[in-house]
Amino acid sequence: MNKTKRIEILTRLREQNPHPTTELQYNSPFELLIAVILSAQATDKGVNKATEKLFPVANTPQAILDLGLDGLKSYIKTIGLFNSKAENIIKTCRDLIEKHNGEVPENREALEALAGVGRKTANVVLNTAFGHPTIAVDTHIFRVCNRTNFAAGKDVVKVEEKLLKVVPNEFKVDVHHWLILHGRYTCIARKPRCGSCIIEDLCEYKEKVEF
């Protein structure tokens, strides 16, 4: 795909959604961090159902530590892998207090040193909480980038590298949200909704479907 097409795609996505953000509900960098840890192999909707009960009770590292492991599990037991996620969250809260004065660090190395936080989670927090031009590639973004040929790559790291290379700076802060929402609601895994897609004429997918 050439540069002109990419810029037109980004322009249309921006016109459709000028101020995109995550569908996870949060009111602080810490709440976002916990929500993103919980979202691995889970839906944002499922995470929001759990955190809307958890956060009014515990939305700081110390408050979650005060809940204890079993107390935390009682709030997140509807989410897949809740046992391991609870253990990671407890460890992360302890580290935030001991190493970061209870605050979420604004750098990748410190974030990725936290339990349950990998590159993708760190990218989401840096981008969404702090406005960094990072791009977290999940299954939706991976599919959209390869299917449309916007930024094809054999794995998520390659797609991330390609996106950082081909997306102009003015679009970098928002492109993660545009692509994830496009993949979640239009360019879905099975039977993509090509007929209602605002970038259908620019997409290079050879098996477009009319829906």
Swiss-Prot record:
Catalytic activity, reaction form: 2'-deoxyribonucleotide-(2'-deoxyribose 5'-phosphate)-2'-deoxyribonucleotide-DNA = a 3'-end 2'-deoxyribonucleotide-(2,3-dehydro-2,3-deoxyribose 5'-phosphate)-DNA + a 5'-end 5'-phospho-2'-deoxyribonucleoside-DNA + H(+)
Cofactor binding: number and manner: Binds 1 [4Fe-4S] cluster.
Keyword Glycosyltransferase: no
Principal EC category: lyase
Domain of life: Bacteria
Enzyme Commission identifier(s): 4.2.99.18
Residues at which [4Fe-4S] cluster binds: C187, C194, C197, C203
Alphabetically ordered keywords of this record: 4Fe-4S, DNA damage, DNA repair, DNA-binding, Glycosidase, Hydrolase, Iron, Iron-sulfur, Lyase, Metal-binding
GO MF: 4 iron, 4 sulfur cluster binding; class I DNA-(apurinic or apyrimidinic site) endonuclease activity; DNA binding; DNA N-glycosylase activity; metal ion binding
Names of the cofactor(s): [4Fe-4S] cluster
Gene3D superfamilies associated with the record: Helix-hairpin-Helix base-excision DNA repair enzymes (C-terminal), Hypothetical protein, domain 2
CDD domains attached to this UniProt entry: ENDO3c (cd00056)
Family: Belongs to the Nth/MutY family.
Function: DNA repair enzyme that has both DNA N-glycosylase activity and AP-lyase activity. The DNA N-glycosylase activity releases various damaged pyrimidines from DNA by cleaving the N-glycosidic bond, leaving an AP (apurinic/apyrimidinic) site. The AP-lyase activity cleaves the phosphodiester bond 3' to the AP site by a beta-elimination, leaving a 3'-terminal unsaturated sugar and a product with a terminal 5'-phosphate.
Name listed for the protein in its UniProt record: Endonuclease III
